[in-house]
Regions:
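Active-site loop of classical SDR/Rossmann-like NAD(P)-dependent oxidoreductases
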Residues: 62, 106-117
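A general structural signal for well-ordered alpha-helical segments in protein cores
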Residues: 5-6, 114-118, 144-145
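Beta-strand scaffold of nucleotide-dependent catalytic cores
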Residues: 54-57, 80-82
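Structural motif
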Residues: 51-52, 75-77
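C-terminal helix-rich "cap/oligomerization" subdomain common to oxidoreductases
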Residues: 48, 119-161
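Short polybasic amphipathic segments
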Residues: 69, 85-97
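Rossmann-like dinucleotide-binding domain that binds NAD(P)(H)
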Residues: 1-52, 58-63, 135
Length: 161
């Protein structure tokens, strides 16, 4: 359930993670447990230089599709917030209220999917290598497999090179 987050983490970290520790539980849907998976999970990725990435996922939110990113560094912080259905926000004595997050990933990433397809077609047309490429997909899968093993065995796992 977090393969895309693991892939993105590689680019945000700027270097390959070398170790993963994962935890998970079933808090929402018994059918997911019966399928051998979790509905709530967290991983910590560590790089050789000591960079740390924490990813948390849940299969269900009550307020729309939740996808956020924060990067903290020695000179500041970068935050990518949820995309809301609209930008209207009201303020009253009881507090602030805004629109819901977009309800589904297709709405949230429509422009990104179109840009991705355009880039892929351009790469194929010009004979260049698309980004991400097959090696990027393989690396994300190796991290996911190591995270699954970590969750199953309850220990940190080295990510294969």
């Amino acid at each position: 359930m977090m393969i895309h987050d693991l892939d993105m983490a590689r680019f945000v970290l700027g270097e390959e993670p070398v170790e993963v520790f994962a935890v998970g539980s079933n808090l929402i849907d018994e059918a997911i447990r019966e399928a051998g998976d979790v509905d709530t999970a967290a991983v910590i990725l560590t790089t050789a230089s000591g960079r740390i990435c924490q990813i948390t996922n849940s299969r269900r939110t009550t307020y729309g599709y939740d996808k956020r990113l924060e990067v903290h560094g020695s000179k500041g912080m970068l935050r990518v917030s949820n995309v809301l259905e609209n930008l209207v926000e009201s303020a009253k004595i009881t507090g602030f209220q805004s629109a819901l997050s977009q309800p589904f990933f297709l709405e949230r990433f429509e422009a990104a999917y179109l840009a991705e397809m355009k880039h892929f077609v351009e790469a194929v047309s010009t004979g260049s290598t698309p980004i991400p490429n097959a090696q990027d997909g393989l690396r994300a899968q190796l991290i996911a497999d190591a995270a699954t093993l970590s969750w199953q065995e309850g220990r940190a796992v080295a990510i294969p090179k």
